[in-house]
Amino acid sequence: VMMSGKRWGYVVQFFCLLVFLGMSPFLTKMDGRKTMSVSSDSVRSQNVSDEVKPVVALTFDDGPNASSTPILLDGLKERKVRATFFLIGENVEKDENEKIVKRMYEEGHLIGNHTYTHCNLSKLETGEAKKELEQTDTVIEKITGKQPVFARAPYGELPVDSEQDLSRIYIGWTVDPLDWMTEDTGAVVKTVVEEINPGDVILLHDCYPSSVQAAIRIVDLLQGKGYEFVTVDHLIMD
C-alpha cells in the first residue's frame, strides 16, 4: 500500500518525537494504513521500576456526546481508567457538553484537539486548517484553562504544514476496530482483544452507544489480562 506524502510526514513527525524521547518505534500496517506505536520492549525499558503490567492507551474521537459520553466516563471512573479524548470543537459547544469536558479534565483524562468541524485538514488551505485547530484550542482552553498539545487529524490526514507546527503533537492509532461502521459490540471487542499488544493505541468513538459498551467490555477483558490503561502522553513520554 502506497502512503501519501502528507501521511508519511505524519509518521516521520511522530517518529522524530519518539527518537527524541529515546524510544524505539515500529510501524504497523492495519486496514491499508500505517501508523506509529511503541513496542512492548521500548515501553518497559522506559520504566525505571520495570513495571510488570503492559500498558496501552484508550482513545476516543468525535465527542463529546451528551448521552453516551457520560456513560463512558462513569464506566472508566468505576474501573480507575484514564483515557484520551480528541474532541470536536463544535460538539463541545453543543447543549451541556461543556460540563462533560470539565468533568473529563477533572477526572484526569487527557483532552486533545480533533478540529472544529471534523474536516479533512489536508484539503484545506494553511490558514483554514489553522483556524479549525485554533478555534478548538480556544473552546477547550476556555473550559480547562489549558491549551491542548495533542491532536488527532480526522481521517489521519494532516495539514500541509504539520511538520512545521512544533506546538502540536499529532497522535495516530494502531488498533482500529472500525466501531463507527457497526453496532455489533461483540465484533468490536473481539477485534481489539485479538489484535492488542503492549504499547498500542486503541481508536474508538464515544459518540456511539455501542462503542461505549464495547469500550467498557474491552477495559474489563484487558485488565483481566494484566493490562494497564494510560493516556497517550504517558504512553509516549514515560
Where in the sequence are the language-model features?
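Residue-identity detector for glycine
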Residues: 5, 9, 22, 32, ...
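Active-site beta->alpha N-cap acidic-glycine motif
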Residues: 33-122, 128-129, 135, 139, ...
